[in-house]
């Protein structure tokens, strides 16, 4: 009986995902700001801003990457921090 209980505990621990998945605002263009759950292992959100003829564009999502000059990139590491 103890062996069965121990086996159930081990299986439960292995099957559960103890990692926290990050939630970022997602805004790609003119659709509007929503949220997305980032893939496992992704630890940053971004907000990217640049100017166009029609005004300032803002894009948001999961991740953080290098951008070209003239683009402002802000990266952060907490849920909904890129709003």
Swiss-Prot record:
Keywords: Acetylcholine receptor inhibiting toxin, Disulfide bond, Ion channel impairing toxin, Neurotoxin, Postsynaptic neurotoxin, Secreted, Signal, Toxin. Disulfide bonds join 24-45, 38-62, 64-75, 76-81. It is found in: Secreted. InterPro entries: Snake_3FTx (IPR003571), Snake_toxin-like_sf (IPR045860), Toxin_cobra-type (IPR054131). This is Three-finger toxin MALT0052C. Expressed by the venom gland. Pfam families: Toxin_cobra-type. One of its GO terms (molecular function) is toxin activity.
